Amino acid sequence: MSHGFETTTSFHFYIFHGFSVGKSNQCAILIVSLRNQLACDKITKRVGKMDKRIYIIGAGFAGQTIADDIKRKKIFGKVNAFIDDNKDIIGTTIDGIPVLGPISSVTSILSNSELDEAIIAIPSAPTERIREIYETLTQNGFNHIKILPGISQVIEGTAHLVQTREIDPLDILGRTPVTISLKESLGYLRGKRVFITGAGGSIGSELSRQLLSGGAERLYLFGHGENSICGIYRELRLLQAEGVGEKATIVPIIGDMRDREYVDYIVRQTKCNVIFHCAAYKHVPMMEENQVAAVENNVFGTKNLLDAALAHKVDRFVLISTDKAVAPVSVYGVSKMICEKLVLDAAKRAAENQSFMFVRFGNVLGSRGSILPVFQNQIKTGGPITVTDEKMERFFMTIPEACSLVLQTGGVGENGKSYLLDMGEPIKIIELAKQIIKFSGLEPYKDIDIKIVGSRKGERLIEPLWLKEENPQPTKYKKLLMLDNKEYESSRLEKLLTELHPICFYTKGKENLFRDKALLVKLLCDDCESLRDFYEETKKDGQLRTDLL
């Protein structure tokens, strides 16, 4: 088997699991979606064989229906056989197609067969089942594998029914993502005007996709980057063309959270009912190099939005927060900690029918700049994969599940409350690196090396999700915890913002303070003990530039 990064041989399966013959509306929805995918495959095909040899794993209603489609539309290839666990049909034929089995014997079956491509389509199987079949295939040299969306994605309208995709490592990370009913959780948004900041980012764009099917009257996609806002706007319009949220009005808005007057104007003009505040500068090492920008954008951008929401009677305000706000050791982390305090302070001034809250969670897999795409790119270039420390670990959640829980929280959350998503158990980064290498059909340290490079500025080995005094308590909603708020005086917060403002914004009479990074760090360290201790310790170790303190 070649360990290069361009495959010359691929394999094509359709794997269906958990379906029986009957009048299932879910099956009908799935079959329509699969037919649409086949049609799009036909349209988007650039190169490849027209007589692909296909094996369908699963000989039930869904498998038979898609086999019939392939048979009628010969351009897609030819179904050579079904592979199934049903002893009653193994050894028989269905519409002239032999049924082989069981699925556990897939290796011996395929070793004596000729085939071309692999597409896993397990509409209702858990992650563990996908992992089992995937590993069986890859361990026997079948490495170019694709996957079709699951039935829950199709029903909820979150699946991109355009074409098959390369299998995503999220499918085999060993934990089944949390699923909730969007129809139930988005009831509070029906007929409402929803404003999403950072709508072009990883979290903001996924929130926008899920919101589209929630019955909102209008979606305002607010962001600073025109390319990312244009991208999500076009994507949502395509989804509307497929019948998802077709009645909603989608409005792209280019703007800057730091522009106080414009933020107030746009909130007033849109008359939005709900705000999901996702916008933030988030890359820790980058923000350690641009500390003033982190505070200017994250802190004052959030304050501008909160003030506008209070002034113009926005019903619900939900801040997306991060585990890096817990006993922060970076300027980014401190900026998000201050944002949490700003939300709780706004809640004290909220009108009776207003609710301000934040939702905190750890890392999401697959976001722009996160370790997953970084590792994948490092593998594509031949390695090595770079890991900070063998002991480093993080909590992970998929973007769709995090966003669905955020949307649920927006509906059930109470004014002035703090919420935390249950992230499960932490994952060691080095183990994740090994997993991604194996997933790519390669061997860690043999084909792709793993290099330990040491901590970067603002990083720590373990990121806690809460402080001891926050005492997380379960709610009646799955994977949603409530925190006890840590007391913080409003006057202290106001004083800190007053001192930080002339550093971030040019102020007459205080010109000498503008962009004074050393003063900004000193003010933050004076206010945040964990940041001060971390900076002092790293300074002793010679890891921190002298101009930071």
Name each model feature, range by range.
Residues 254-271:
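Conserved Rossmann-fold cofactor-binding substructure of NAD(P)-dependent oxidoreductases
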Residues 54, 179, 184-188, 345-363, ...:
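Strand-loop microenvironment adjacent to phosphate/nucleotide-handling motifs in alpha/beta enzyme folds
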Residues 131-148, 218-225, 268-269, 289-316:
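NAD(P)-cofactor binding segment of oxidoreductase domains
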Residues 44-143, 227-231, 248-251, 255:
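A solvent-exposed beta-alpha-beta segment
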Residues 110, 114-115, 216, 267, ...:
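Proline-aspartate-enriched helix->loop->beta-strand connector
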Residues 154-162, 277, 281-284, 288-337, ...:
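Conserved Rossmann-fold NAD(P)-dependent oxidoreductase catalytic core, especially the SDR/UDP-sugar
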Residues 194-210:
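N-terminal Rossmann NAD(P)H-binding glycine-rich loop of SDR-like oxidoreductase domains
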Residues 131-193, 310:
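Flexible, Lys/Arg-rich cytosolic regulatory linkers and terminal tails that connect or flank
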